[in-house]
Design a protein with these regions (language model features):
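Bacterial N-terminal signal peptides
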Residues: 13-22
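Bacterial N-terminal signal peptides that target proteins for export
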Residues: 2-14
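Serine/proline-rich low-complexity intrinsically disordered segments, especially terminal tails, linkers
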Residues: 4-5, 19, 26-28
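Flexible, surface-exposed loop/linker segments and immediately adjacent secondary-structure boundaries
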Residues: 27-180
Length: 182
């Protein structure tokens, strides 16, 4: 009887450990690669991973393209295209699907990045930041393209968005630099 009593806590500990491992693994993924042309890679915790369609994307990933292009869809439906010779870091991604709110922070280190707002920007726009070496962009539910040169100089182009019903609209972005805010 005493050996049975000792086994119950051991089994419970084992089951909880397996559940914790499953939860931590499922929480790590913030999106997927949805389209890929030529080679691109993700650097994750020092490991280099060649990307392909359905490669999971996680917080702290560095996405780097050479002659390739990678499209990413986050779990809140945010879409990001990383074009040729570009580098993008996923700094932070937190999303509550029930409330459709969260926080997104990206760093564009080099090249051209196209951003299309998902649910976080539509419902918690103040919590979406995209940084370059020389500027920071706050997103208010829209699409834009940014280009970062090797010297860090950055340019931004605001684009019209199309909602789920096909209606076109233009959101807004706030660009901040050391010289001020636009």
């Amino acid at each position: 009887m005493s050996s049975l009593i000792q086994m119950v806590p051991l089994r419970a500990t084992l089951i909880l450990s397996i559940l914790c491992l499953f939860v931590s693994t499922s929480l790590a993924k913030v999106g997927n690669v949805t389209a890929q042309t030529r080679a691109a890679q993700i650097t994750r915790k020092g490991d280099k991973i060649l990307t392909e369609v359905d490669t999971p994307v996680e917080m702290r990933d560095l996405i780097q393209t050479l002659k390739g292009r990678t499209d990413i869809k986050f779990v809140d439906d945010t879409k990001v295209s990383v074009t040729e010779y570009s580098k993008l870091i996923i700094d932070e991604f937190v999303y509550n699907p029930e409330k459709k709110t969260g926080k997104l922070s990206l760093k564009a280190a080099l090249g051209t990045i196209r951003y299309s707002s998902g649910k976080i920007a539509r419902n918690s726009g103040q919590n979406v930041k995209i940084k370059s070496p020389t500027a920071s962009v706050s997103v208010r539910g829209t699409d834009f393209t940014m280009n970062v040169q090797e010297d860090g100089a950055s340019s931004f182009i605001l684009l019209p968005s199309v909602d789920d019903s096909g209606k076109s609209y233009v959101g807004s972005i706030d660009v901040s630099t050391l010289g001020g805010k636009v």
